[in-house]
Amino acid sequence: KARPESTLTNWVADALYNQAIKVYTEPIAFAYQNYGGIRINNLGKGPVTLIKIYEIMPFDNTLVIVKLSGSEMQQFFDYMAAGGGSPVSASARYVIEAGKPVRITIHGKALDLTGSYYVAMTDYIANGGDNLVYLKDKPRLDKNVLVRDLLIKESKDKGMVKSALDQRVTLKN
């Protein structure tokens, strides 16, 4: 698993997004998966087994959606960029220049600082994990669905797991 993106982190973030739009009726901007929450470095070749899913996600985290204002989204992207990039679903893209996020897009449109967005993430992050304390008091929905179960469902729904590096997060020096 590499930064700012890898095939494994892209697959996990995309899987969370794909499953979130099935579980929730709110319009999901993107899915975020904290880098440290993915506990293996790569999937390797061959079938995705239940054991492999547990190795990826050994925690009993649930998938929640958190409502953020446009300025809070900017703060969230600032956090991700400062850490060298974080796994996001393909519906979000950003470039990191000098440790700052630029050219942030959501579903192909520039981030609207006056808008509001729903972001899918684990309850660990929504509860302030990884120093994202400001998320704790944000409006959220939690249908108590385990992230691990959603990864299992995604791998069953899609059959073969495919993921590519698509420059959703780009690091420029």
Task: Annotate each language-model stretch with its function.
Residues K1-R3:
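Glycine-rich phosphate/diphosphate-binding loops and the adjacent beta-loop-alpha structural elements
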Residues S6, N10-N173:
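Feature captures C-terminal
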